[in-house]
Amino acid sequence: MENNKLFNLKLTDLAKNKIKNLLKEEKNKNKKFRIYISGGGCNGFQYNFILDEKINKEDHLILFLDVEIVIDSISLQYLIGGVVDYKEELLESCFFVINPNAKTTCSCGTSFSI
């Protein structure tokens, strides 16, 4: 398990609380909160957030006090220095990333380019 300070990655209190609630509701206690980046969206890359029980050799298990997050090595390089947050609005509730490495982002905050 690695410390979040190593990657200068931050998790807001809103995001931490939502992750805790999702994991508490999950019947499979082996699942962890995973963040990964894939090709897609309107800017080339998009953020993905899932509950996943599989942890691969190249994954990093990062501890934020009492919340663990799994991020694969390739995705992590795009997230260094970022802030993972959560918003709950009338029309939409979602996780999003404030990413200082992104050159452009879409208006919804789910995709970016480097």
Curated annotation (Swiss-Prot):
The lineage of its organism: Bacteria, Pseudomonadati, Pseudomonadota, Gammaproteobacteria, Enterobacterales. Keywords: Iron, Iron-sulfur, Metal-binding. Iron-sulfur cluster binds at residues 42, 106, 108. Its cofactor is iron-sulfur cluster. Required for insertion of 4Fe-4S clusters for at least IspG. Homodimer. Pfam families: Fe-S_biosyn (PF01521). Belongs to the HesB/IscA family. PANTHER family: IRON-SULFUR CLUSTER ASSEMBLY 2 HOMOLOG, MITOCHONDRIAL. This is Iron-sulfur cluster insertion protein ErpA. It comes from Wigglesworthia glossinidia brevipalpis.
